[in-house]
Amino acid sequence: MNRFDVWLVMKNIEKGRVVDNIGLCAILSPDELNDLPNLIVAPMTREFEDLPSRIEFEFEKNKGFIMLDQLRSIEKNNFIKKMGELESKVQPQLCSCLQEFFAL
């Protein structure tokens, strides 16, 4: 499990607005934190919403959006199957958006 890997994940159910319980997520945790029991992920969707925290991507010839406004920490035992890796041109966009998102 590495940063920018795409996994099929059983997401934690939360109250309120919840993205589907099982779905694709991009790992955002730095690889240096791989020894921890949880990883920080961003869910992925095909539904467009005009938000600055949504990063457009293409994965397996399908377009979609990484939802940085839906970040969550997921236990490793909820990771079902590795599906691939985010394309390299999206990775710096993610990092830049996260830096802006969490700017103090």
Locate the predicted segments by residue.
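Conserved functional hotspots at enzyme active or ligand-binding sites that engage polyanionic ligands
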Residues: M1-L104
